[in-house]
Design a protein with these regions (language model features):
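Mature, function-bearing regions of proteins
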Residues: 2-425
């Protein structure tokens, strides 16, 4: 028998490789989900005993591992959804902060604050999340001394105090942040969020709401979802200010895609909104073909994510939770850089070495815009949590933010995070 008859053919080898890969995906795709649900199996029968630390750890399965892009984008869209309430759109239009040259900063600031208190530990019963432990070790005392979650909430509260936002507006925003990721995972994700994960989101975000001093938060996720639906039906109504913000938002989002695709992208975003939000924002009805295209695209994304893509090797987060280096000089406060980029390179460091050479070459060839390059105007040295917000407030409120964060923690903010304030307002 000749050797050619004993060796498998190339098509056979290819088929074996493809089948082996698909089997690998099938065997590993649910790795994180199964791990979390085995770890907290004792809580599934009794949701009421779920602690804050456990809830935060559970939320990380979807947010950082399984469907991070869907969770992150849906939470951004949850904020955008508030633009369809005239009471809130009037406030936002009055701030002048959603102008073309500043809107990207507002998006990254919001992402940094939300990501920080979503992944950094709180001083509560139980160990920190596995994600935090992987970056910082198992020292629970060190985790308890990490003030970043409280600094992010304190700064967010300080910013909100400058606007006449009503309690119900805060509460419906909280509901959007809890439930929109659940709905988007059902529509676009390769898996849905389990009842345990939904309850964990409620437990975690209810605590955030309490730290924000939101009153009358319902005692269950079901009650909050029902309340939010009724509130939205009554108050999400058409207004010119809604439309102004919608146009600005669509322009900002479309700027991240090639120019030839922006028209279609805009139509797809409007379809994602749903009819109530579209009407409130006074945007045009979209053709059935565009809705069908969105549904087909969502189905393909779900199929590919479930059957063709292996699980992530590393968690994805907009911010780092690793220990930060001690500043070189007494007058150089510790700063951080985000791990994500919006349409402008806010807070990103300048490139060095060969990357810097490549960047200059791309600029010279016109392959990259100067607006995409980190620079002082984009705060390329990084951010500090007590400085987050509009440029005009970058240097104010620091001492009060430190004070409020310390009060929430039960001890003063210390170490590299503690910095003297320039003003108290």
């Amino acid at each position: 028998m000749s050797p050619s008859n004993t060796l498998p053919s190339l098509p056979s080898i290819g088929a074996i490789a493809v089948l082996s890969y698909l089997l690998f995906v099938r065997l590993t795709r649910w790795r994180v989900y199964n791990h979390v649900h085995r770890k907290y199996a004792h809580r599934i029968a009794d949701f009421d005993t779920l602690t804050l630390a456990e809830a935060q750890d559970i939320t990380h399965a979807a947010m950082l591992w399984d469907v991070p892009s869907i969770v992150m984008n849906s939470m951004s869209f949850a904020i955008v959804r508030t633009y369809a309430f005239p009471a809130m759109s009037r406030i936002l239009c009055g701030t002048k902060e959603l102008q073309p040259d500043t809107v990207s900063r507002r998006y990254i600031d919001t992402a940094i604050l939300v990501a920080t208190y979503s992944v950094c530990p709180f001083r509560t019963k139980g160990p920190p999340s596995e994600f935090y432990v992987a970056a910082n070790g198992t020292d629970e005392d060190a985790a308890a001394a990490d003030p970043r979650a409280y600094l992010a909430i304190a700064r967010m509260n300080w910013l909100h105090e400058h606007y006449p936002i009503k309690n119900d507006d805060f509460l419906v925003t909280l509901a959007f942040l809890i439930f929109l990721p659940v709905r988007w995972a059902e529509r676009f994700g390769w898996r849905t969020l389990s009842p345990l994960e939904v309850h964990a989101r409620f437990v975690f975000w209810k605590h955030i709401g309490e730290l924000m001093h939101i009153r009358d938060i319902p005692d269950s996720a079901v009650e909050l979802e029902v309340w939010a639906e009724e509130y939205e039906a009554r108050h999400m109504t058409p207004a010119d200010t809604n439309h102004i913000l919608a146009e600005g938002m669509l322009t900002e989002l479309a700027s991240s895609v090639p120019s030839f695709a922006r028209g279609l992208f805009r139509r797809l975003v409007i379809c994602v909104m749903g009819e109530r939000m579209r009407i409130a924002m006074k945007l045009p009805v979209q053709p059935p073909a565009v809705h069908a295209l969105l549904d087909i695209g969502a189905a393909l994304v779900r199929f590919a994510g479930r059957h063709l893509f292996p699980p992530r090797l590393h968690a994805y987060c907009a911010v780092s939770v690793k220990p930060v280096p001690i500043p070189k000089g007494d007058n150089e406060p510790t700063r951080m850089h985000p791990l994500m980029k919006v349409t402008k390179p806010w807070y990103l460091p300048r490139t060095t070495g060969m990357w810097r050479v490549l960047e200059k070459l791309m600029l010279a060839l016109g392959l990259r815009s100067i607006d995409d390059v980190p620079a002082p105007k984009y705060d390329d040295k990084g951010y500090r949590l007590e400085e987050i917000g509009p440029v005009r407030w970058k240097t104010v409120g620091h001492a009060l933010v430190m004070q409020k964060a310390g009060e929430m923690m039960g001890c003063p903010v210390q170490g590299v995070w503690a910095q003297p304030s320039t003003k108290i307002t």
